[in-house]
Amino acid sequence: MSGPGATAVGIKVKDGVVLAAERRMSYGGFIMSKAARKVFKVGDRMGMACAGLYADMQAIARALENEIRYYEISNKRKMKVRSAARLLGLILYSNKLFPLMTETVFGGYDDEPRIFVLDPVGSVIEEKYSAVGTGAPLAMALLDKEYREDMSLEEAQNLAIESVKVASGRDSLSGDGIDVLVIPFGGKPSIRTVSLEA
């Protein structure tokens, strides 16, 4: 994806989901912000990490949150993670003639943890781990090498942080800290910020 840069990753393990993204918002060579949160909680057991245009990230996070809330109130039941990912794909696809320029890793749990990757026009692909953005090739190299299905949630957090650090070290459009969203299976999501120097 050309344009604004970023690195966002997602990892699924048996104990939950980890989503992480760096905090730099840049356009070309200009850094507009060093504190742009590109990781979003969605409901009480889902979230997304994004790369692309910051306003588009915020718009799809709000739209998806509202649609899920409406569904859950109307139907008196929780929306499945796969259904929420498909809904996000429909939101993106409905704008295909004027796309929302955001690549997204979406994850959460219902009967099991799940991760989905979406492109700006709504393609939905289920994965065990993934990276998006300008730093994705660097992050994926580490994820491909180090990911194991039997990892603990803590090991997945460390791998997500390290993969974003590696990408930020070489991708000038990524940097300035990492936001990490941890969604433990059966638990509540939590976000923390990690320094790139840590």
UniProtKB/Swiss-Prot annotation:
GO terms for cellular component: cytoplasm; proteasome core complex, beta-subunit complex. Keywords: Autocatalytic cleavage, Cytoplasm, Hydrolase, Protease, Proteasome, Threonine protease, Zymogen. This is Proteasome subunit beta 1. Belongs to the peptidase T1B family. The formation of the proteasomal ATPase PAN-20S proteasome complex, via the docking of the C-termini of PAN into the intersubunit pockets in the alpha-rings, triggers opening of the gate for substrate entry. Interconversion between the open-gate and close-gate conformations leads to a dynamic regulation of the 20S proteasome proteolysis activity. It is found in: Cytoplasm. The keyword Protease applies. Residues 1-6 form a propeptide. The active site is at T7. Gene3D superfamilies: Glutamine Phosphoribosylpyrophosphate, subunit 1, domain 1. It comes from the Archaea. It comes from Ignicoccus hospitalis (strain KIN4/I / DSM 18386 / JCM 14125). It is an enzyme of class 3 (hydrolase). One of its GO terms (molecular function) is threonine-type endopeptidase activity. The lineage of its organism: Archaea, Thermoproteota, Thermoprotei, Desulfurococcales, Desulfurococcaceae.
